[in-house]
Amino acid sequence: MENAGPDAPVRLTPMMEQYIEIKAANVDSLLFYRMGDFYELFFDDAVAASAALGITLTKRGKHLGEDIPMCGVPVHAADDYLQKLIAKGYRVAVCEQVEDPAEAKKRGSKSVVKRDVIRLVTPGTLTEEKLLDPAQANFLMAMGRTRGDGALALAWIDISTGTFRVAETTPDRLFADIMRVDPRELVVADSAFHDEELRPVFDLIGKAVTPQPATLFDSAAAQTRIQHYFNVATLDGFGQFSRPELSAISGAIAYIEKTQISERPPLMRPEREHEGGTLFIDPATRASLELARTMSGKRDGSLLKAIDRTVTGGGARLLAERLTAPLTSPKEIAPRLDSVSWCLSEQTLCEALRLELKGVPDMPRALSRLAVGRGGPRDLGALACGFEAAGGIASLLDGALLPDELAAAREAIEKMPAGFAAHLDRALADELPLLKRDGGFVREGYNSELDEMRALRDQSRRVIAGLQADYIEETGIKSLKIKHNNVLGYFIEVTANNSGAMTDTDEAKSRFIHRQTMANAMRFTTTELAELESKIANAADRALSIELAIFEELTAEAVAHADSIRAAASALSVFDVSTALAVLAEEQGYCRPHVDDSLSFNIVAGRHPVVEQALRRQAANPFVANDCDLSPQRDGGDGAIWLLTGPNMGGKSTFLRQNALIAILAQMGSFVPAGSAHIGVVDRLFSRVGASDDLARGRSTFMVEMVETAAILNQAGEHSLVILDEIGRGTATFDGLSIAWAAVEYLHEKNRCRALFATHFHEMTALSEKLERLSNVTMRVKEWDNDVIFLHEVAKGAADRSYGVQVARLAGLPEAVVNRARDVLHQLEAGETSGKADRLIDDLPLFSVMLQQEKPKPQIQAKDSELANAVAAISPDELTPREALDLIYKLKELAGKA
């Protein structure tokens, strides 16, 4: 903040002095400074917030001779503005009034109401419903590092659900492990942040990185910090953690304590993830396969969007977690597949389960908001609604013979706190307000004193009307009214002409106490009216006070049952994911994959899950299924390599991606888009498909390609699956060919992994003669009348052409350019055959085709059209042999007429 230091030699108001003092302690955050019904921002904070939020920038007072910039947002709409600021990378310190203004006045007329920061709002510490995506986890991640050996670990927490995990990592895996979790915020020690070895990773992550003092990550003090946070005397029940893991856990907890100030979100005990338990997918592969987001950052078009049939927020998050971290143990994958199989076999029951699941709110997030003091009556209502749905699901499953995973989930649901569920049902009204301060959320009959206070508060109009009638009868003034305003409270009002009955005698004056004289009226009160007003006011305050006490009581009970509530919610998510994957499998015709520890990779009639659905939505031609068999050719052998050649637009990239996606789906525990699938678990998946540059880091498309290819060749092992597309195309032809050639040889001899390698270098097909595990396959095409028809079928063999000119024609290049390209191609091919290619280049007339008259397109005759229409109307898959023979005779007859 410029020009706002506390030592500035200028007289400021006490309020502004207070602001500057608080801001000095929160220099890295925008300060939301509470003033009445607004959060105000000043100085540079105001300028930044005004631009980010599109709100008016005004001014308040002067500092160093210049106006102080100011802007503000209403308290009731603060969440909407916080959402925009967080999305733009800002952190916000929320400063509230922590004493009543009346208390401040007791210290003197110029005393300022005490204020303090009650919370730091950062991307990784959100709990508000408006600020969170229901289908996406909101992780805060901390990186721990030990001195000396530099060992690394990551701990990640979603305070909106209580999820807490930790795992060791290494410098070469660090970026991949971070991107797998995809945290909203990464907290690192400031010493690590400036480390030359790690800094490139932090630069890639950008604004999400938050450096913090190294003392927060002290592994020696971690045990005490963990014990204090979880309120335990020993960590014996937490399992064993390494020093870097303790450092990461300490950093994560310390940052939560720092941002939540006095609140303590209820977290699960940290769960350790073991190395190798999940499929390693490097960041480039994760991006190119568009698992959770497309290359443009959108959810639509991603694999997650294509397979998501969940109906709850928790289920959507669990599905995303499984997709981004597929398992590598067949023993762990099988129970998930068993769950989907059971759901498919019990479709009627599963439909009933999904109807119940649709009524399940986000219980873990409601619980977290309640625990940190940001919850409301509707969060308690969410728990009650969730308990009701869970009870319905438990009833539906009563007596059902379930597979292991679903049986464990049912057990967790049955252990939910039934007593607390009944308590909520008795206590909460049917219609709940958003804010607890609005009252009205406690059911009538739950608390007798509350009912009494409400009656007095709500029946005040009837009581006042009765008193007004008594005063009219007593004074004889028929126009007498009892009214109310915020200044006088309740008062009696009569016209000036009628005031004599209330002022002419001493008895009347003592009875009716004069309060105010207006131009045409006079206002009075009575002891009786004042006492009634006090009772009414106190009744409203007392009713709200009782309700708030009940709210706190219910909240405390909810937090006390946090573990069982979260366990039940997690179980409901398991049922949601299992039934959703069953719906997907039934809807799309997926099969159960056979997953084991072998090196097999045999996909029969595989399809691309995203492209297939897109074609169906567009009512286009159906997706062409293809086989892929990378299994060892003999027992004990290594996986195979397929060298794929074929034209542009032939479907090579789609084929490559679909096999990688099938492996991911199988290992996450889903059925797969294929006729059958036998997959030996993949431990590392690498994909280099599609071209992109990295201009910000000074890297060309070719350089990016080489860096990613190097990572693959250096890390792939026999259980890996490698997908490579067009390696070497970004440089001179012979350079590219030699790099691609050497890469395939290395994959075959050194990595010995299963691989799909697509290329336009047809010379590489000769490798099949020297590499025993390499097979040539190609994308089939048909040529007809100078046109090429892409069949999108994979077949054994090799392509001898790329059909680039035909693709250029389909893309809409001017006919003159296409004709010129065809002439150049023919002469280059002839020159290559005769060894005179360079001389022929010089002999080509310079774009002479531009001078040629473009040939008119042939007119289609009616008879030709009749024949074409007849062919187009054929559905080959639906014809019997007899019908096909009859059709051949008919077409021959039409052809004869033509």
Swiss-Prot record:
InterPro entries (alphabetical): DNA_mismatch_repair_MutS, DNA_mismatch_repair_MutS-lik_N, DNA_mismatch_repair_MutS/MSH, DNA_mismatch_repair_MutS_C, DNA_mismatch_repair_MutS_clamp, DNA_mismatch_repair_MutS_core, DNA_mismatch_repair_MutS_N, DNA_mismatch_repair_MutS_sf
Pfam families (UniProt xref): MutS_I, MutS_II, MutS_III, MutS_IV, MutS_V
Keywords recorded for this protein, A-Z: ATP-binding, DNA damage, DNA repair, DNA-binding, Nucleotide-binding
Similarity comment text for this entry: Belongs to the DNA mismatch repair MutS family.
Record protein name field: DNA mismatch repair protein MutS
One CC-aspect GO term: cytosol
Single GO term (MF): damaged DNA binding
HAMAP family cross-referenced by the UniProt entry: MutS
Keyword Glycoprotein set for record: no
GO terms under biological process: mismatch repair
Binding site for ATP: G646, P647, N648, M649, G650, G651, K652, S653
Purpose: This protein is involved in the repair of mismatches in DNA. It is possible that it carries out the mismatch recognition step. This protein has a weak ATPase activity.
